[in-house]
């Protein structure tokens, strides 16, 4: 079986490609992660987002601990063929391990001299409740 579509992706020196995850409908950017060839292949095969966890050094099926899986509607490759975009339905409405809708919940406000990052999105569910009883969870 040919997998030439995998060869079109420009993988980095570690065999990874950056992935932007966008919510179908709202177009919110939910998160950023990485995939290796196997993760991208499994994502296509299952219709659910699978990433490569750099900290765990293994495949990471998004939602495997929290239940907040990402159902993939569309996969796109950018013009340089080195970034992947997933358009997903976020099950449970929570993409971030902090219990928020999206990982980009800190907003810069102010000037270059006195600016700071401020939390602008609420926690929808306490991470301790999301991951309670999950052995070895690290809220990724």
Swiss-Prot record:
Query: Quick one: where is this thing mainly located?
Result: cytoplasm
Please give the cofactor(s) recorded in the UniProt entry for this protein: Mg(2+); Zn(2+)
Q: Where does Zn(2+) bind?
A: 79, 96, 103
Reaction equations catalysed: 1-(5-phospho-beta-D-ribosyl)-5'-AMP + H2O = 1-(5-phospho-beta-D-ribosyl)-5-[(5-phospho-beta-D-ribosylamino)methylideneamino]imidazole-4-carboxamide
Which processes are annotated in GO (biological process)? Answer: L-histidine biosynthetic process
Q: What GO terms are given for molecular function?
A: magnesium ion binding; phosphoribosyl-AMP cyclohydrolase activity; zinc ion binding
| Cofactor detail note | Binds 1 Mg(2+) ion per subunit.
Write down the Pfam families for this protein, in alphabetical order: PRA-CH
Q: In which pathway does it act?
A: Amino-acid biosynthesis; L-histidine biosynthesis; L-histidine from 5-phospho-alpha-D-ribose 1-diphosphate: step 3/9
Q: Please give the superkingdom of this protein's source.
A: Bacteria
Q: Which residues bind Mg(2+)?
A: 78, 80, 82
* Keywords noted in UniProt: Amino-acid biosynthesis, Cytoplasm, Histidine biosynthesis, Hydrolase, Magnesium, Metal-binding, Zinc
Q: Share what the entry says about its subunit structure, partners included.
A: Homodimer.
- Could you tell me what this protein does? Catalyzes the hydrolysis of the adenine ring of phosphoribosyl-AMP.
NCBIfam families, per this entry?
Answer: PRK00051.1
Would you identify the family this protein belongs to, as annotated? Belongs to the PRA-CH family.
**Protein name as catalogued:** Phosphoribosyl-AMP cyclohydrolase
Q: Which organism is it from?
A: Ralstonia nicotianae (strain ATCC BAA-1114 / GMI1000) (Ralstonia solanacearum)
Its gene name is: hisI
